[in-house]
């Protein structure tokens, strides 16, 4: 009986601890499930004036939980690296919009927020010393990132190695939207166009090289078949090294 009683008590307090999160999810089905959607009313109007601080805590926990789920989901939808050696990374670098996006993709912002949460758990001294700007850190290769349209890309290579035409517009229920791709490549005007930064040129030959990854986009193949396919776009700038012979 004692063990049964203790089990019931633990289960009871476990349910009480989980209740604020569930209530926050129920109240936030119209707005808390995804960032940027506004709900009506205030915490005080729902639970009373004394529940404001407790509600804010549960809201913050819910928001962090949503971010973690989105980041985990991005990991799940990446292609199998064993079957596709060239697909070293899959990210949401494609956006459908009527105009050029003003910010990087959402997952980039979520990863930055996640890094901010990790940094918030550090002490002030650790954060100060971990800041790359304070340590004078520089990238090995200079890169640039920008949104491009299908009009700029024209064609791309799919996962089977075939060349497909990238469609500029995607039909939707209320018209058409343009496909935008967030590409990252080596900066031809940067200081690393002659070689990687910080490499000993006496022993190594270095070169900054743009690498590609797969993203999903609306395309048309050589047989005029339209569909969503994984295509390669520029996603990073890496340093390649070769040892100098005769040394």
Swiss-Prot record:
Query: Pro-region residues?
Result: 19-128
| Residue(s) at site: Cleavage | 57-58
Glycosylation sites recorded in the entry for this protein: 121
Signal peptide span: 1-18
Tissue note: Detected in blood plasma and in saliva (at protein level). Brain. Highly expressed in hippocampus, amygdala, cerebral cortex and cerebellum. Also expressed in heart, lung, skeletal muscle, testis, prostate and placenta.
Superkingdom, taxonomy of origin: Eukaryota
Q: Keyword Glycoprotein: yes or no?
A: yes
Q: What outcome follows a substitution of residue 54 to A?
A: Abolishes processing by MBTPS1
Changing residue 2 to I has the effect of:
Found in a patient with congenital central hypoventilation syndrome; uncertain significance
| Any one GO biological process | cell surface receptor protein tyrosine kinase signaling pathway
Q: Does the keyword Signal apply?
A: yes
**Listed result of changing residue 122 to T:** Found in a small consanguineous family with intellectual disability; uncertain significance
Any Pfam family the entry gives: NGF
Q: Which GO terms describe its cellular component?
A: axon; cytoplasm; dendrite; endoplasmic reticulum lumen; extracellular region; extracellular space; perinuclear region of cytoplasm; synaptic vesicle
InterPro entries cross-referenced by the UniProt entry = Brain-der_neurotrophic_factor, Cystine-knot_cytokine, Nerve_growth_factor-like, Nerve_growth_factor-rel, Nerve_growth_factor_CS
Q: Where does it live in the cell?
A: Secreted
Similarity comment: Belongs to the NGF-beta family.
Q: How does it assemble?
A: Monomers and homodimers. Binds to NTRK2/TRKB. Can form heterodimers with other neurotrophin family members, such as NTF3 and NTF4 (in vitro), but the physiological relevance of this is not clear. BDNF precursor form: interacts with the heterodimer formed by NGFR and SORCS2.
Function, in words: Important signaling molecule that activates signaling cascades downstream of NTRK2. During development, promotes the survival and differentiation of selected neuronal populations of the peripheral and central nervous systems. Participates in axonal growth, pathfinding and in the modulation of dendritic growth and morphology. Major regulator of synaptic transmission and plasticity at adult synapses in many regions of the CNS.
- Know the name of this protein? Neurotrophic factor BDNF precursor form
Q: Which gene encodes it?
A: BDNF
């Amino acid at each position: 009986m004692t063990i049964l009683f203790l089990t019931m008590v633990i289960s009871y307090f476990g349910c009480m601890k989980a209740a604020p999160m569930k209530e926050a999810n129920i109240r936030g089905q119209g707005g808390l499930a995804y960032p940027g959607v506004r709900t009506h009313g205030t915490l005080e109007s729902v639970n009373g004036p004394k529940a404001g601080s407790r509600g804010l805590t549960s809201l913050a926990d819910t928001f962090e939980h949503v971010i973690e789920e989105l980041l985990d989901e991005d990991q799940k939808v990446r292609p199998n690296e064993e079957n596709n050696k060239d697909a070293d990374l899959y990210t949401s670098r494609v956006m459908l919009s009527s105009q050029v996006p003003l910010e990087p993709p959402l997952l980039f912002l979520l990863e930055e927020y996640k890094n901010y949460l990790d940094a918030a758990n550090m002490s002030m001294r650790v954060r100060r010393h971990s800041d790359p700007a304070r340590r004078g850190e520089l990238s090995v290769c200079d890169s640039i990132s920008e949104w491009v349209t299908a009009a700029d890309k024209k064609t791309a290579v799919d996962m089977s190695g075939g060349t497909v035409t990238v469609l500029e517009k995607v039909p939707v229920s209320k018209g058409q939207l343009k496909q935008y791709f967030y590409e990252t490549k080596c900066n031809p005007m940067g200081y690393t166009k002659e070689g990687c930064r910080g490499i000993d040129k006496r022993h190594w030959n270095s070169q900054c090289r743009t690498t590609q990854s797969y993203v999903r986009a609306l395309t048309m193949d050589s047989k005029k078949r339209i569909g969503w396919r994984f295509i390669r776009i520029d996603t990073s700038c890496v340093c390649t090294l070769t040892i100098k012979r005769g040394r």
